[in-house]
């Protein structure tokens, strides 16, 4: 594209300058060929999907933005009662969820309303309302940056952790497609009447007025999730200024038992077992992947904390903004930073740094951003 748009036009936070180049390969084969060509130049490159998890600097990007727009959903052979899908990386995630619900397939219905592309879902290891993509993920087709080869990577090879993966932490390349396996819990009643996976999130169970572990129709569960997300400004809506964001800006921190015990007694925390180390199977000719991917966690981390609680109890409330800034904490959800209409990327980074500094000063816990920051530091 000879005259690319600013990244503010391609991201949900609506900030970011103009890249040098923007390429949008139309299909899988063109994506492979284009990526290899870009990599052969040695220039800087950036992958961009739906733009819901990327915040780019105001001066743009000095290099090539490779925008993933490939589409398509293919049904694969599967055992009775199971559904297998191969989804092209550029397929919008929520459109995929809507498709599965219409067909009565269960397994990702609680992930309704999450913006972005399907290829980014395993990279970020998305999850919400008690459901994780990890539980439905079979694997991905992956174009490796270092070798230029296309590999099929099983779920166990992706180093999945809480909102992270080896793909996010340094395993450079392009996810070409994602394979998922869902359940077909069909019951009489027509489209959307199949039963959901057991409800594992208290707020969702309360919204549906059912006990934890219950099942409702996948359609009913999707509608409940979308309503909950909309109440927090977490569904893209031109009429809702709180939806001009990158979703939750900070992940819930995972800390040691000692750090968790030092917090006030009313601080929410969830006990965790020690994480399993990454398993990256052979991709290189010597039997070892040529890139050393850092593990998800190096020590016996045992508790997950609520980032929202930490932010609120550090004195930062909904709607908070720094003087003269176009960025603010969402009026509906303290985990989200929103563009109030004229924010710059610098405004967003400044507010995020302020929030992180307050939490660290008050509780000794460092919050980590969930979106990918391009040309920005906190």
UniProtKB/Swiss-Prot annotation:
Its main location: cytoplasm. SUPFAM superfamilies: FAD-binding/transporter-associated domain-like, Uridine diphospho-N-Acetylenolpyruvylglucosamine reductase, MurB, C-terminal domain. The keyword Endoplasmic reticulum does not apply. Pathway: Cell wall biogenesis; peptidoglycan biosynthesis. Its cofactor is FAD. One of its GO terms (cellular component) is cytosol. This is UDP-N-acetylenolpyruvoylglucosamine reductase. The active site is at 163, 248 (proton donor), 370. It comes from Leifsonia xyli subsp. xyli (strain CTCB07).
